[in-house]
Amino acid sequence: MTDKLSKYIITVFGASGDLSKKKTFPAIFGLFKQGEISKDECKIVGYARSKMNDEELRDRLKPFLLKQVSKESNGEKIVDEFLSNVTYVQGPYDTDEGYQKLGEAYKEIEKSLNKGSPVNKLHYLALPPSVFGSVCEKIKNNIYVNEDDAKTKIIVEKPFGHDLESSRQLQKELAPLFTEDELYRIDHYLGKEMVKNLLILRFGNILFNSAWNKENIQNIQITFKEPFGTEGRGGYFNDIGIIRDVMQNHLLQVLTLLTMERPVTFDSEAVRDEKVKVLKAIAPIDHDDIIIGQYGKSXDGSKPSYLDDETVPEGSKCITFAAMNFQIRNERWDGVPIVMKAGKALDVGKVEIRIQFKPVASGMFSQIPNNELVIRIQPDEAVYLKCNMKTPGLSTTTKITDLNLTYADRYEDFWIPQAYEALIRDALIGDHSNFVRDDELDVSWALFTPLLDYLEGENAPEPTIYAYGSRGPVELNXYMHXHNYKYMHGDIYQWPVTRPDSE
């Protein structure tokens, strides 16, 4: 069940931090700009230890908000109107004093917002996980509300732990304080337009729904590529690595939506029940069936290696690229390789899904490419299906082409919300579908922790060095071939703009 969008105070904890300035406040502003929240029904409060007043916070936020309205003639006016709705409370995170001050600020806001009666509170914790427990305890003891028309909701940011043990410890701290209905664990990939579209694409189209199984699908790829390295943040990244950064969370969420069974309804609990079921069906990750890499200098020497980053410990084995195969032991997917790949400092920046179907029966055609469904999550959302067609003319030769749905070409003047915009709105209306449940989190860490222990142990394998700006480790193509992926056009898909002289 979801709530109607009612009166709220949204408090951003960590208001002076980078995440708040670059993501959280811009997302709330995006909802304001689109009319999803209004000054009459929603007030915004920033909370942090930094000593500043309302105007100083507004001045810090303004440049980031102006970027969103740079093409609008009245953009600055919209930004100023939003910022007039933002106030600031300064205080510590670990003592009651600041929260009591926050409570007094709430009372003043509620006088104008709801004639003095309590309103809903959404607390967005843009903070390190190490302080989640203590901050939540202070919220519960000082500013918690749970009435018919006034509820408390908490959004917490990833990472939700460093491994299975730390994740369970974090949950142990939060569980006595707030119910699952009050907690929203945010994984921003679940707010991306194409990720939210996966269930509609699968279950709303009979041609895909009926072919979505081991009888028809030969291979699935989930790919994350960044064209840049750690750029001076290697010291931070060194403690995380690419697997914790995007694979255990973002890409695993994509995998569950791709492979889960049809839920009974679109109710958030029904969707998350099916995600947990498919997670439990995944076999342990085979430590001998992975590729790990670390980027070196670019082939021309112009781009630095990971170890050239001054913040990186000497001789670090940190993994900046990984590819691994998932096997789902159930009736639908048993035997289908599902390869997850992610890396930094690669040739392009993109996130996409490739579902390659099995070849048609031999006999009529001597050789014909496999059909392939490609779902591009970013940049430039798109879905296209690679199909075989007759080449125009007298011959009966075939050519691969595509049925193409590129969002920018098909949907004009539509607002496609950014991930954080979509998820904050979901939290405001009480929709948990695109947030991570406690048991889901536990199963995902149970799947990845043995692999991480192996890769970070005393006998950890050496990552393969690959060139900055390349496609990744040289053994990647052979790895994909071994997992049933059939490349076309010299291993790189060519967009099908075909002319007679190119035959």
Swiss-Prot record:
A single cellular component GO annotation: cytosol
Amino-acid positions noted as binding NADP(+) 1 in the UniProt annotation, renumbered to this chain: 14-21, 49, 158
Residues the record lists as binding D-glucose 6-phosphate: 158, 188-192, 226, 245, 344, 378
Superkingdom classification of source: Eukaryota
This enzyme's EC code(s): 1.1.1.49
Gene Ontology terms describing biological process: glucose metabolic process; pentose-phosphate shunt, oxidative branch
Classification via PROSITE patterns: G6P_DEHYDROGENASE
Active-site residues (renumbered): 250 (proton acceptor)
Phenotype seen when the gene is deleted: Leads to slow growth on glucose. Confers methionine auxotrophy and hypersensitivity towards hydrogen peroxide and sulfite.
Enzyme class: oxidoreductase
Residues the entry annotates as binding NADP(+) 2: 341, 350, 354, 376, 384-386, 471, 487
Record key words, sorted: Carbohydrate metabolism, Glucose metabolism, NADP, Oxidoreductase
Reaction it catalyzes: D-glucose 6-phosphate + NADP(+) = 6-phospho-D-glucono-1,5-lactone + NADPH + H(+)
UniProt pathway annotation: Carbohydrate degradation; pentose phosphate pathway; D-ribulose 5-phosphate from D-glucose 6-phosphate (oxidative stage): step 1/3
Molecular-function GO terms, alphabetical: glucose-6-phosphate dehydrogenase activity; NADP binding
Record: residues binding NADP(+): 14-21, 49, 158
Family as reported in the entry's similarity comment: Belongs to the glucose-6-phosphate dehydrogenase family.
UniProt function note: Catalyzes the rate-limiting step of the oxidative pentose-phosphate pathway, which represents a route for the dissimilation of carbohydrates besides glycolysis. The main function of this enzyme is to provide reducing power (NADPH) and pentose phosphates for fatty acid and nucleic acid synthesis. The G6PDH activity is required to cope with hydrogen peroxide and potassium bisulfite stresses and plays a role in adaptation to conditions used in wine fermentations.
HAMAP family per record: G6PD
PANTHER family linked to this entry: GLUCOSE-6-PHOSPHATE 1-DEHYDROGENASE, GLUCOSE-6-PHOSPHATE 1-DEHYDROGENASE G6PD
Matching NCBIfam families: zwf
Protein name per its UniProtKB record: Glucose-6-phosphate 1-dehydrogenase
Lineage of the species this protein comes from: Eukaryota, Fungi, Dikarya, Ascomycota, Saccharomycotina
